[in-house]
Design a protein with these regions (language model features):
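N-terminal subdomain of nucleotide-sugar transferases
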Residues: 1-72, 198, 268, 272, ...
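Nucleotide-sugar-dependent
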Residues: 18, 254-260, 317-321, 329-348, ...
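Membrane-proximal helix-turn-helix segments that form the acceptor-binding/catalytic region
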Residues: 25, 118, 122-132, 149-152, ...
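A conserved catalytic-core segment of Leloir-type glycosyltransferases
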Residues: 41-125
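Acidic anion/phosphate-binding donor-loop and adjacent secondary structure
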Residues: 51-52, 72-77, 180, 223-241, ...
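Carbohydrate-associated surface elements
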Residues: 202-205, 222
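Conserved catalytic-core segment of nucleotide-activated headgroup transferases in glycan assembly
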Residues: 224-225, 236-300, 310, 314-316
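A charged, aromatic-enriched C-terminal amphipathic alpha-helix characteristic of glycosyltransferases
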Residues: 385-396, 403-439
């Protein structure tokens, strides 16, 4: 008889958001492993649909979308229909965290966060109500944070006997927006440690920050080559340009975390152009995302504004198409004493492109997991601010070598380690999760 798995994730297909990818892919590949999968999820914030995830969801037979009370979504929809979005100017110091001053701004931010908490509470109540309709038992409930409510609903499923085992997963670290909520956070974390049969997170850094290092296990994000269109359907590139592609966010919505800083790569490219390794007419800095002005500001500061090719916010399919056309894929992150766990899902999406990946990592610590993964897989190089001049010189040398290969029409990707890369395919990650479930069943027998 097939194992039964219950997945609780606010973010899920067909939502067009990065948080929906992980649970959707795990559900898809657990289904292919023979699991009967039931999913409880929310409706998302903006109603936009990801056609790729929508296709994945067709393999699932029981996805229950809960329409929680969400005044923020309604407000967003009203604003969107009332007027086109205004383009915001870049911050004066793009390397500093964006700050909103003034009492009215602080009150507005507090009201927004307060409503988010009540929206989360609404999802929890709807999820528990839906759980009461299900026939058990499920062999396992897998809940993936954020928000808070997913684990609270999963705790109810475990406590009520609806699910025999509970795996509590984290794609982000748990944090509270207000100091007065910190006692609740401590109780929440105690509940997880006491009742979850297994704690998993997308990185070892997150496990460490949440004090799960001794008991938790890393289940990283990954990639799915089925997301890519067939190569034969894509026209071959004919232009003679060196395309550096950045997809996604630049600003960070975390306290005490600066904007993602890609200027080290831009400076390395400008230095290469000054050394006649390529002309600025041959260079394209390609961006897709909703922070075009900041991307342009970074490029202008490095003398590369004329090289920018801005696509704005695009669908995931369009983003993947731009990545396929890249010569180099660029990303950025941070590694701080209080923020060690950043192994972004964009890294693994980039991995399936067979293109060199360059990451610029800000922060006061060296030796990030991002740097380790890029080194172990041979997929590229991570330049860390904390490593100082050594990493900057290595980045310049690596960029120059890529340009020499490009000018000589040689393959740019020459150091890739296939086996190391394949461990991040969602097929492998679902098999790893299946193995843990079977291990927990043996321990519980």
């Amino acid at each position: 008889m097939n194992r039964r798995a219950l997945i609780i994730s606010y973010y899920f297909a067909p939502q067009n958001t990065i948080g929906a990818i992980r649970p959707t892919k795990l559900a898809k590949y657990l289904t292919r492993l023979g699991y009967d999968v039931t999913v409880l999820c929310g409706t998302g914030m903006d109603g936009k649909r990801d056609a790729i995830l929508e296709k994945d969801a067709r393999e699932l037979h029981d996805v229950r979308i809960l329409n929680e009370w969400n005044p923020l979504r309604a407000l967003k929809e009203r604003r969107k229909s009332a007027a086109p979005a205004a383009v915001s100017a870049p911050p004066a110091d793009t390397a500093a965290p964006a700050k909103r001053g003034g009492l009215l701004h602080r009150l507005a931010d507090s009201a927004y966060i307060y409503l988010r908490l009540w929206t989360d509470r609404s999802f929890q109540h709807l999820a528990v109500r839906e759980l009461k309709k299900l026939e058990g038992p499920f062999d396992v409930v897998f809940s993936t944070y954020a928000p808070l409510s997913v684990h609270q609903a999963a705790f109810w499923a475990k406590k009520s006997g609806l699910a025999r085992l509970w795996i509590a997963d984290f794609r982000d670290e748990v944090g509270m927006p207000f100091r007065w909520l910190e006692p609740f956070q401590r109780r929440y974390m105690r509940m997880l440690r006491k009742n979850a049969d297994l704690l998993t997170a997308v990185s070892n850094g997150f496990l460490e920050m949440m004090d799960f290092s001794q008991t938790g296990r890393m289940l990283s994000n990954g990639f799915d080559r089925e997301d890519l269109p067939e190569t034969k359907n894509e026209p071959a590139r004919t232009d003679d340009t060196f395309r550096v592609v950045y997809c996604g966010h630049l600003k960070e919505g975390r306290r005490n975390v600066a904007c993602r800083d890609i200027r080290p790569m831009f400076r390395a490219l400008k230095k290469a152009a000054d050394a006649n390794l390529l002309s600025l007419e041959q260079l394209r800095l390609v961006y897709c995302g909703d922070e075009s002005e900041l991307f342009r500001a970074y490029a202008a500061e490095c003398g590369l504004e004329a090289c920018v090719e801005d696509h704005g916010k695009v669908s995931r399919a369009a983003s993947l198409a731009l990545q396929r056309e890249a010569d180099v894929l660029l990303m950025a992150s941070w590694y701080l004493r209080g923020q060690k766990g950043i192994l972004t899902g964009k890294l693994f999406e980039y991995m399936m492109m067979d293109k060199p990946v360059i990451c610029c990592t800000a922060g006061d610590l060296a030796g990030s997991e991002l740097k380790q993964v890029l080194a172990e897989t041979g997929m590229g190089f991570c330049c860390e601010e904390a490593a100082g001049e050594s990493d900057r010189q290595t980045l310049e040398a690596y960029t120059a070598e890529l340009l020499r290969r490009w000018q000589g029409k040689q393959p740019l990707m020459q150091e890739k380690k296939e086996a190391a890369v394949e461990q991040y395919h969602y097929v492998q990650l679902a098999q790893k999760l299946d193995g843990w479930i079977q291990e927990l069943e043996r321990e519980d027998a």
